[in-house]
Amino acid sequence: HRQRMPLKRRTVMRKIEKRAVICMALAILLAAGMSVFLIRYFAEGGKWASSAFNRHLYDSDGVLISGTVLDRDGDVLSSVENGHRAYYENETVRKATLHAVGDLYGKIGTGVLNAFADKLTGFDLVNGAFGAERGSNLYLTLDARYNYEAYRALGGHAGTVAVYNYKTGEILCMVSAPSYDPLNVPKNLEENDRYKGAYLNRFLSSAFVPGSVFKTVTLTAALENLPDAETRTWNCTGSVQIGDETITCSGVHGEQTLKEAFAHSCNAAFAQIAEELGADTLRRYTEKAGLTSAYSVDGLPTAKGTFNWDSITAGQLGWAGVGQYHDQVNPCAFLLWMGG
Protein backbone atom coordinates (compact mmCIF):
# COMPACT_ATOMS: atom_id res chain seq x y z
CA HIS A 1 0.00 0.00 0.00
CA ARG A 2 1.11 3.57 -0.75
CA GLN A 3 2.17 5.43 2.34
CA ARG A 4 0.20 8.57 3.08
CA MET A 5 1.89 11.76 4.32
CA PRO A 6 0.58 12.72 7.73
CA LEU A 7 -1.91 15.62 7.64
CA LYS A 8 0.24 17.83 9.82
CA ARG A 9 3.26 17.36 7.56
CA ARG A 10 1.22 18.16 4.44
CA THR A 11 0.02 21.39 6.06
CA VAL A 12 3.60 22.42 6.87
CA MET A 13 4.71 21.73 3.29
CA ARG A 14 1.87 23.85 1.89
CA LYS A 15 2.89 26.72 4.16
CA ILE A 16 6.49 26.40 2.98
CA GLU A 17 5.36 26.41 -0.66
CA LYS A 18 3.24 29.54 -0.10
CA ARG A 19 6.10 31.29 1.64
CA ALA A 20 8.44 30.32 -1.20
CA VAL A 21 6.02 31.79 -3.75
CA ILE A 22 5.72 34.99 -1.69
CA CYS A 23 9.50 35.23 -1.34
CA MET A 24 9.91 34.68 -5.07
CA ALA A 25 7.36 37.41 -5.83
CA LEU A 26 9.10 39.79 -3.44
CA ALA A 27 12.46 38.98 -5.04
CA ILE A 28 11.04 39.71 -8.50
CA LEU A 29 9.57 43.00 -7.27
CA LEU A 30 12.88 43.90 -5.64
CA ALA A 31 14.78 43.10 -8.84
CA ALA A 32 12.30 45.11 -10.91
CA GLY A 33 12.54 48.03 -8.51
CA MET A 34 16.33 47.93 -8.57
CA SER A 35 16.29 47.79 -12.37
CA VAL A 36 14.04 50.84 -12.57
CA PHE A 37 16.23 52.65 -10.03
CA LEU A 38 19.44 51.83 -11.93
CA ILE A 39 17.94 52.91 -15.25
CA ARG A 40 16.81 56.20 -13.73
CA TYR A 41 20.14 56.61 -11.94
CA PHE A 42 22.10 56.24 -15.17
CA ALA A 43 19.68 58.58 -16.98
CA GLU A 44 19.01 61.17 -14.29
CA GLY A 45 21.70 60.73 -11.65
CA GLY A 46 23.34 63.97 -12.64
CA LYS A 47 20.09 65.89 -12.14
CA TRP A 48 19.54 64.31 -8.73
CA ALA A 49 23.04 65.13 -7.57
CA SER A 50 22.89 68.70 -8.87
CA SER A 51 19.57 69.48 -7.21
CA ALA A 52 19.48 72.79 -5.37
CA PHE A 53 18.74 70.82 -2.18
CA ASN A 54 22.31 69.47 -2.22
CA ARG A 55 24.00 71.87 0.20
CA HIS A 56 27.40 70.51 -0.74
CA LEU A 57 26.98 72.20 -4.14
CA TYR A 58 24.71 75.17 -3.39
CA ASP A 59 24.84 77.92 -0.80
CA SER A 60 21.96 78.89 1.48
CA ASP A 61 20.48 81.10 -1.26
CA GLY A 62 20.42 78.27 -3.80
CA VAL A 63 23.40 79.56 -5.79
CA LEU A 64 25.61 76.92 -7.43
CA ILE A 65 29.07 77.13 -5.84
CA SER A 66 30.79 74.48 -7.91
CA GLY A 67 32.37 74.56 -11.37
CA THR A 68 33.83 77.10 -13.78
CA VAL A 69 32.41 78.31 -17.11
CA LEU A 70 34.90 79.45 -19.76
CA ASP A 71 34.65 80.68 -23.34
CA ARG A 72 36.43 79.04 -26.29
CA ASP A 73 39.65 80.97 -25.57
CA GLY A 74 39.73 80.04 -21.90
CA ASP A 75 38.44 83.37 -20.59
CA VAL A 76 36.58 82.69 -17.34
CA LEU A 77 32.94 83.76 -17.66
CA SER A 78 31.89 82.47 -14.25
CA SER A 79 33.69 80.75 -11.39
CA VAL A 80 33.59 80.26 -7.63
CA GLU A 81 35.73 82.57 -5.52
CA ASN A 82 35.86 82.21 -1.73
CA GLY A 83 32.64 80.22 -1.72
CA HIS A 84 30.72 82.71 -3.88
CA ARG A 85 29.70 82.61 -7.55
CA ALA A 86 31.64 85.22 -9.56
CA TYR A 87 31.31 86.48 -13.14
CA TYR A 88 33.52 88.12 -15.77
CA GLU A 89 34.92 91.46 -14.60
CA ASN A 90 33.50 93.48 -17.52
CA GLU A 91 29.84 94.46 -17.06
CA THR A 92 29.00 94.45 -20.78
CA VAL A 93 30.44 90.95 -21.19
CA ARG A 94 28.36 89.81 -18.22
CA LYS A 95 25.22 91.15 -19.89
CA ALA A 96 26.21 89.80 -23.31
CA THR A 97 26.79 86.26 -22.02
CA LEU A 98 24.05 86.17 -19.38
CA HIS A 99 21.66 83.94 -21.33
CA ALA A 100 24.44 81.49 -22.16
CA VAL A 101 26.06 81.39 -18.72
CA GLY A 102 22.92 81.84 -16.63
CA ASP A 103 21.97 83.90 -13.60
CA LEU A 104 22.61 83.18 -9.93
CA TYR A 105 19.16 81.85 -9.09
CA GLY A 106 18.22 79.73 -12.11
CA LYS A 107 15.67 82.15 -13.56
CA ILE A 108 17.22 81.64 -17.01
CA GLY A 109 16.56 77.97 -17.65
CA THR A 110 18.81 77.71 -20.71
CA GLY A 111 21.89 79.06 -18.91
CA VAL A 112 24.63 76.49 -18.31
CA LEU A 113 24.61 77.16 -14.55
CA ASN A 114 21.12 75.69 -14.55
CA ALA A 115 20.96 73.38 -17.57
CA PHE A 116 24.40 71.80 -17.12
CA ALA A 117 24.76 71.96 -13.34
CA ASP A 118 25.53 68.22 -13.23
CA LYS A 119 28.54 68.70 -15.52
CA LEU A 120 29.79 71.70 -13.54
CA THR A 121 29.64 69.74 -10.30
CA GLY A 122 31.98 67.07 -11.64
CA PHE A 123 29.34 64.38 -11.19
CA ASP A 124 30.11 60.85 -12.35
CA LEU A 125 28.22 57.60 -11.85
CA VAL A 126 30.88 56.08 -9.56
CA ASN A 127 31.82 58.97 -7.28
CA GLY A 128 28.65 61.02 -7.53
CA ALA A 129 29.10 64.75 -7.02
CA PHE A 130 32.15 64.26 -4.84
CA GLY A 131 34.49 63.18 -7.63
CA ALA A 132 35.87 66.66 -8.15
CA GLU A 133 36.62 68.80 -5.12
CA ARG A 134 35.85 72.11 -6.82
CA GLY A 135 33.71 70.93 -9.69
CA SER A 136 34.59 70.82 -13.36
CA ASN A 137 35.54 73.29 -16.06
CA LEU A 138 32.93 73.70 -18.78
CA TYR A 139 34.21 75.26 -22.01
CA LEU A 140 31.68 76.93 -24.29
CA THR A 141 32.08 77.40 -28.04
CA LEU A 142 31.20 81.07 -27.55
CA ASP A 143 33.75 83.84 -27.88
CA ALA A 144 33.25 86.55 -25.24
CA ARG A 145 34.58 89.20 -27.67
CA TYR A 146 31.94 88.41 -30.30
CA ASN A 147 29.18 88.52 -27.69
CA TYR A 148 30.48 91.83 -26.39
CA GLU A 149 30.42 93.44 -29.85
CA ALA A 150 27.03 91.94 -30.72
CA TYR A 151 25.45 93.19 -27.51
CA ARG A 152 26.79 96.70 -28.12
CA ALA A 153 25.52 96.59 -31.71
CA LEU A 154 21.97 95.91 -30.48
CA GLY A 155 22.11 99.34 -28.89
CA GLY A 156 19.55 98.63 -26.20
CA HIS A 157 16.99 97.14 -28.58
CA ALA A 158 15.27 93.84 -27.83
CA GLY A 159 16.37 90.99 -30.06
CA THR A 160 19.02 88.36 -30.57
CA VAL A 161 22.32 88.02 -32.42
CA ALA A 162 23.93 84.69 -33.20
CA VAL A 163 26.91 83.53 -35.25
CA TYR A 164 27.87 79.93 -35.92
CA ASN A 165 30.48 78.02 -37.86
CA TYR A 166 28.42 76.27 -40.52
CA LYS A 167 31.18 73.69 -41.06
CA THR A 168 31.46 72.54 -37.44
CA GLY A 169 28.11 73.66 -36.02
CA GLU A 170 29.83 75.58 -33.21
CA ILE A 171 27.89 78.59 -31.95
CA LEU A 172 30.39 81.44 -31.60
CA CYS A 173 28.00 84.18 -30.53
CA MET A 174 24.61 83.99 -28.80
CA VAL A 175 23.26 87.24 -27.41
CA SER A 176 19.73 87.90 -26.21
CA ALA A 177 18.31 91.27 -25.19
CA PRO A 178 17.01 92.74 -23.00
CA SER A 179 19.63 91.56 -20.56
CA TYR A 180 20.94 92.68 -17.18
CA ASP A 181 23.99 92.46 -14.97
CA PRO A 182 23.75 89.25 -12.88
CA LEU A 183 25.86 90.89 -10.17
CA ASN A 184 23.60 93.95 -10.01
CA VAL A 185 20.06 92.75 -10.70
CA PRO A 186 17.57 95.63 -11.11
CA LYS A 187 15.17 95.68 -8.17
CA ASN A 188 12.12 96.19 -10.39
CA LEU A 189 13.24 93.81 -13.13
CA GLU A 190 10.00 91.81 -13.27
CA GLU A 191 7.76 94.90 -13.29
CA ASN A 192 9.77 97.14 -15.60
CA ASP A 193 8.79 96.92 -19.29
CA ARG A 194 12.39 97.72 -20.17
CA TYR A 195 13.32 94.21 -19.00
CA LYS A 196 10.30 92.40 -20.41
CA GLY A 197 11.43 88.92 -21.45
CA ALA A 198 14.84 89.33 -19.81
CA TYR A 199 14.78 85.72 -18.56
CA LEU A 200 14.10 84.42 -22.08
CA ASN A 201 16.85 83.29 -24.43
CA ARG A 202 15.39 84.70 -27.62
CA PHE A 203 17.75 82.72 -29.84
CA LEU A 204 16.59 79.36 -28.50
CA SER A 205 13.14 79.90 -27.06
CA SER A 206 11.41 82.53 -29.22
CA ALA A 207 9.91 82.83 -32.68
CA PHE A 208 9.69 86.04 -34.70
CA VAL A 209 8.22 87.32 -37.94
CA PRO A 210 11.18 86.64 -40.25
CA GLY A 211 10.67 89.48 -42.70
CA SER A 212 12.68 89.57 -45.90
CA VAL A 213 15.10 86.79 -44.97
CA PHE A 214 12.21 84.42 -45.71
CA LYS A 215 12.58 85.43 -49.36
CA THR A 216 15.47 82.94 -49.50
CA VAL A 217 12.88 80.16 -49.12
CA THR A 218 10.60 81.68 -51.76
CA LEU A 219 13.63 82.14 -54.03
CA THR A 220 14.65 78.49 -53.67
CA ALA A 221 11.11 77.34 -54.47
CA ALA A 222 11.00 79.60 -57.54
CA LEU A 223 14.32 78.37 -58.93
CA GLU A 224 13.25 74.75 -58.57
CA ASN A 225 9.63 75.06 -59.73
CA LEU A 226 9.38 77.88 -62.30
CA PRO A 227 11.15 76.78 -65.53
CA ASP A 228 11.77 80.34 -66.73
CA ALA A 229 12.54 81.81 -63.30
CA GLU A 230 16.01 83.02 -64.30
CA THR A 231 15.01 84.58 -67.63
CA ARG A 232 11.65 86.25 -67.06
CA THR A 233 11.01 89.63 -65.39
CA TRP A 234 8.63 91.04 -62.77
CA ASN A 235 7.41 94.62 -62.65
CA CYS A 236 7.43 96.71 -59.47
CA THR A 237 5.56 100.03 -59.30
CA GLY A 238 6.00 100.35 -55.55
CA SER A 239 3.12 98.03 -54.75
CA VAL A 240 1.10 95.21 -56.24
CA GLN A 241 -2.51 94.15 -55.77
CA ILE A 242 -2.91 90.45 -55.05
CA GLY A 243 -6.41 89.34 -54.19
CA ASP A 244 -7.77 91.73 -51.59
CA GLU A 245 -4.32 92.75 -50.32
CA THR A 246 -2.04 95.57 -51.46
CA ILE A 247 1.54 94.41 -51.08
CA THR A 248 3.72 97.47 -50.60
CA CYS A 249 7.41 97.76 -51.43
CA SER A 250 10.24 99.97 -50.18
CA GLY A 251 10.80 101.48 -53.62
CA VAL A 252 9.84 101.47 -57.29
CA HIS A 253 12.08 98.91 -58.97
CA GLY A 254 10.48 98.67 -62.43
CA GLU A 255 11.11 95.64 -64.65
CA GLN A 256 13.59 93.31 -62.99
CA THR A 257 14.92 89.79 -63.23
CA LEU A 258 14.73 87.37 -60.31
CA LYS A 259 18.35 88.13 -59.44
CA GLU A 260 17.64 91.86 -59.42
CA ALA A 261 14.42 91.42 -57.44
CA PHE A 262 16.31 89.47 -54.80
CA ALA A 263 19.05 92.12 -54.66
CA HIS A 264 16.36 94.79 -54.22
CA SER A 265 14.48 92.63 -51.70
CA CYS A 266 11.41 93.52 -53.73
CA ASN A 267 8.13 92.71 -52.01
CA ALA A 268 6.10 93.20 -55.17
CA ALA A 269 8.07 90.63 -57.16
CA PHE A 270 8.26 88.03 -54.41
CA ALA A 271 4.57 88.37 -53.56
CA GLN A 272 3.75 87.63 -57.22
CA ILE A 273 6.13 84.67 -57.15
CA ALA A 274 4.51 83.33 -53.96
CA GLU A 275 1.05 83.55 -55.53
CA GLU A 276 2.26 81.69 -58.62
CA LEU A 277 3.95 78.96 -56.58
CA GLY A 278 0.89 78.39 -54.40
CA ALA A 279 0.48 77.60 -50.72
CA ASP A 280 1.25 73.88 -51.02
CA THR A 281 4.62 74.51 -52.65
CA LEU A 282 5.60 77.19 -50.14
CA ARG A 283 4.50 74.95 -47.28
CA ARG A 284 6.65 72.12 -48.63
CA TYR A 285 9.73 74.32 -48.98
CA THR A 286 9.21 75.88 -45.56
CA GLU A 287 9.15 72.43 -43.99
CA LYS A 288 12.09 71.32 -46.15
CA ALA A 289 14.07 74.30 -44.83
CA GLY A 290 13.38 73.07 -41.29
CA LEU A 291 11.62 76.26 -40.26
CA THR A 292 8.74 74.42 -38.57
CA SER A 293 11.01 71.99 -36.73
CA ALA A 294 12.42 72.11 -33.20
CA TYR A 295 16.14 71.53 -32.81
CA SER A 296 18.37 70.52 -29.92
CA VAL A 297 21.40 72.59 -28.95
CA ASP A 298 23.34 70.33 -26.59
CA GLY A 299 20.05 69.04 -25.25
CA LEU A 300 18.35 72.45 -25.06
CA PRO A 301 15.25 72.46 -27.30
CA THR A 302 14.47 75.37 -29.60
CA ALA A 303 11.03 76.79 -30.25
CA LYS A 304 9.15 75.61 -33.33
CA GLY A 305 8.28 77.94 -36.15
CA THR A 306 4.62 78.34 -37.11
CA PHE A 307 3.01 79.09 -40.47
CA ASN A 308 -0.71 79.31 -41.18
CA TRP A 309 -1.20 77.84 -44.63
CA ASP A 310 -4.76 76.59 -44.16
CA SER A 311 -7.52 78.64 -45.81
CA ILE A 312 -4.96 81.28 -46.76
CA THR A 313 -6.10 83.84 -49.32
CA ALA A 314 -4.07 84.90 -52.35
CA GLY A 315 -3.22 88.23 -50.73
CA GLN A 316 -2.19 86.61 -47.46
CA LEU A 317 -0.02 84.19 -49.41
CA GLY A 318 1.65 87.17 -51.06
CA TRP A 319 2.55 88.60 -47.65
CA ALA A 320 3.68 85.18 -46.41
CA GLY A 321 6.03 84.87 -49.39
CA VAL A 322 7.90 87.99 -48.29
CA GLY A 323 8.10 86.86 -44.66
CA GLN A 324 5.08 88.68 -43.24
CA TYR A 325 1.48 87.62 -42.50
CA HIS A 326 1.46 85.10 -39.58
CA ASP A 327 4.91 83.63 -40.23
CA GLN A 328 6.88 82.93 -37.03
CA VAL A 329 10.41 81.52 -37.22
CA ASN A 330 12.88 80.53 -34.52
CA PRO A 331 16.25 82.31 -35.03
CA CYS A 332 18.25 79.12 -34.51
CA ALA A 333 16.24 77.30 -37.17
CA PHE A 334 16.82 80.11 -39.65
CA LEU A 335 20.52 80.20 -38.85
CA LEU A 336 20.73 76.49 -39.69
CA TRP A 337 18.79 77.03 -42.92
CA MET A 338 21.12 79.82 -44.01
CA GLY A 339 24.19 77.75 -43.14
CA GLY A 340 22.90 74.59 -44.76
Predicted regions mapped to residue ranges:
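Periplasmic/cell-envelope proteins involved in peptidoglycan metabolism and beta-lactam response
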Residues: R4-L189, A198, A207, D280-K288
